Amino acid sequence: MKEVIQDKLGRPIRDLRISVTDRCNFRCDYCMPKEIFGDDYTFLPKNELLTFEELTRISKIYAQLGVKKIRITGGEPLLRRNLYKLVEQLNLIDGIEDIGLTTNGLLLKKHGKNLYQAGLRRINVSLDAIEDNVFQEINNRNIKASTILEQIDYAVSIGFEVKVNVVIQKGVNDNQIIPMIDYFKNKNIEVRFIEFMDVGNDNGWNFNKVVTKEEMLNMIEQHFEISPVAPKYYGEVAKYFRHKDSDAQFGLITSVSESFCSTCTRARLSSDGKFYGCLFASSEGFDVKALIRNGATDDDLKAQFKRLWSIRNDQYSDKRTMQTIENNRKKKINMNYIGG
């Protein structure tokens, strides 16, 4: 039986984001800078990750509490061995209406068919530039944008619905906005531009690196005729715009200039098995893995999940100032543990 639960600000729980690994094959500066995540960096050992059975058990209980959507993240989730088996298990959960995956796309040709056969239908690909030299500078692994574009084409060809996410940094890749809109408009693939956020401790964020929604729109409107699109559902994070000469759309995710904390319905499970109520969480998180491995029953887990959501009052982006950023520095969980 489903229950309706709300947090302290009246927000229901609708989404569960699961990080299945803290590892990644890219070293993007805004997430896993190579100076910190070098060859000698120690990632989580296999036994510290939640098993697929544990993740499925958790997801079943969250579905009873109102979760309808699950997104699989990382790190890079396609590095998790046999990920399609998790998708198969999640697809059997009553009440889960949508399962998505966020990936850098590099391994889609290798794993895409198995994932599609397991029931995955929606993929978000993180691609921060369309020009090879710009993209190589960002990912620090000499991976060309053209390589990822080929992977996207493959994913579309076997039936996936693909969206593209682009984190925009001033002076780094803001010159990619127009060519990316132009390219994906012709492919009829939604591209979403994300304001650079202060996630984690190590990405060197400050306000001066942010290209705001208004700045992006000013750029875009010099090249395209567009009109706004009404939100599709409560809690939608992207603000969408449609081209007047086609049905193609693009989105802007404005977590800095126009935050959306008031409608956030996401619970997050980190790669080391901890619950977080916010992408910018500065706490240690609640150790779900320890609870499970110490013999908790489903009723025990359900009671804890209800409690954690009922006391949730996170609204970091609504209150973001340089002072709050400084106060939380070195306390926030890094993106490779909690996903984007």
From Swiss-Prot:
**Which keywords does UniProt give here?**
4Fe-4S, GTP-binding, Iron, Iron-sulfur, Lyase, Metal-binding, Molybdenum cofactor biosynthesis, Nucleotide-binding, S-adenosyl-L-methionine
Residues where [4Fe-4S] cluster 2 binds: C261, C264, C278
- Pathway(s) this gene product operates in, as recorded in its UniProt entry: Cofactor biosynthesis; molybdopterin biosynthesis
Residues binding S-adenosyl-L-methionine are: Y30, G75, S126, M197
Task: Write the Enzyme Commission number(s) for this entry.
Answer: 4.1.99.22
Describe how the cofactor binds: Binds 2 [4Fe-4S] clusters. Binds 1 [4Fe-4S] cluster coordinated with 3 cysteines and an exchangeable S-adenosyl-L-methionine and 1 [4Fe-4S] cluster coordinated with 3 cysteines and the GTP-derived substrate.
Judged by the first EC level, this protein's enzyme class is lyase
Q: Name one GO molecular function term.
A: S-adenosyl-L-methionine binding
Q: Which HAMAP family match?
A: MoaA_B (MF_01225_B)
Stated family: Belongs to the radical SAM superfamily. MoaA family.
Q: What does this protein do?
A: Catalyzes the cyclization of GTP to (8S)-3',8-cyclo-7,8-dihydroguanosine 5'-triphosphate.
Q: What's this protein's name?
A: GTP 3',8-cyclase
Task: Please tell me the species this chain comes from.
Answer: Staphylococcus epidermidis (strain ATCC 35984 / DSM 28319 / BCRC 17069 / CCUG 31568 / BM 3577 / RP62A)
